[in-house]
Amino acid sequence: PADAAAGARLSASRCASCHSSSEAIHSTVPLLEGQPKAYFIAQWRAFRERKRTAPVMVTLAAELSEQDVDDLAEHFAALVPPPTAQAAGSDAGRALADRLRCAVCHGPGLKGTSAGAARLAGQKVRYTTWSLQLMRSGTRPHGSAAKPDPLLADLSNAEVESLAAYLASLH
């Protein structure tokens, strides 16, 4: 069984230096607090299998055991994301989230699901903008799609930024 306390110890020694809540220091590294366990484990496997290619994460994924990953996932899933100090989301960003029906996959309040959808609420603006741009181009899979995401394909950069700001404003 997963051990959240062991995950907390691993997080302190292996994760916290990059995955902090500071937008200024690590704006392109996601917050992990509150991410559903299934999502965390799926992303870890993607790094291990090199379907996602951040060099530090690929190396770390190879070093940690399945038990370590389960412990980390249990730890992060149990945490409440820190309040964001980011600007309030725009009405345009909210309208885009509604139009794209983000909650259908990402759950009520866009807090992720036990089925493995990521928590979008409260995520860093810059990280979310970057991720949406990669999914829009097909560089990063969105769900099971390994091609440009049709939901995001027609969004302008300004719309992507508006959506990211709105998502960051949620808690």
Residue ranges and their predicted role:
Residues A62-T84, R126, L151-H171:
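C-terminal capping alpha-helices of c-type cytochrome domains
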Residues P1-A2, R45, E49, A158, ...:
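N-terminal export/targeting leaders of redox proteins
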Residues P55-L60, A85-D91, S144-L151:
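Short, tandemly repeated low-complexity microdomains enriched for cysteine and small residues
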Residues P1-S11, I25-P30, A77-D98, T113:
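Electrostatic cytochrome c docking/interface patches
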Residues S11, F47, H75-F76, A97, ...:
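Conserved hydrophobic/aromatic "anchor" residues
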Residues L79-G89, A103, G107-V125, H171:
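Conserved N-terminal glycine/acidic-rich loop preference
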Residues A8, E23-R52, V58-E63, G107-S137, ...:
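Gly/Gly-Pro-rich "capping" loops immediately C-terminal to redox-active cysteine motifs
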Residues S13-S22, L72, R99-G109, L163, ...:
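The canonical Cys-X-X-Cys-His
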